Amino acid sequence: ILTGSATPNHKGILHSGAGRIAKLRMRPMSLFESGNSSGDISLKDICEGRIEPKISGEVDLRKLIDFIIRGGWPANQETTLKQAAYLPIQYIRAVLDDDVYRIDNVKRDKHKMELLLRSLARNEATTVTNKKLKNDIKEIDDEDIDVETVSAYLDVFQRLFLTDNQKPFEAKLRSSIRIKQAEKRHLSDPS
């Protein structure tokens, strides 16, 4: 297994790896993978109609908040919450300082990228449009950003795996009911 960057340096590579190397997307750990969920309730079972009532116990709000702050980072699972909160901050800083430029050698406004990431966090799991993100930044941060810039920055975030949008549900039925066709916007990790 080889792991690598979203912005690999292709200079000097004589072989693409075609037929030998498969690319796969690595995501942060789920609560089950980190040992913080029993896995008793399966999304697969729910989708297949096998729903059995289960007692999950009391859900502690503070514990849920801790899980969100800690995120799915493997290195964060055994650290203090204060240390765990520091890792995503440093990760975002490193991505904005280095990877954003390296992806295509284009200079971008780091401050506006930070504002857009904050706006995405405020609009997590919604079908917010680029124009609404622009308006959110203006309303909350009192900063102007062009809609085309929002679109370009969202593309960079997607290519750097900072976002992981959810495709809309597509029913294979003919119906008079209109289903929303926009992607739900998600950051790759809640932390």
Segments (PLM) and residue ranges:
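Surface-exposed, flexible loop/turn segments at secondary-structure boundaries
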Residues: 7-8, 171
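Interdomain motor-coupling "hinge/lid" segment immediately C-terminal to the ATP-binding subdomain
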Residues: 4-5, 11-122, 126
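Active-site metal-binding loops of divalent metal-dependent hydrolases
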Residues: 5-6, 190
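Accessory nucleic acid-recognition modules appended to NTPase machines
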Residues: 81-191
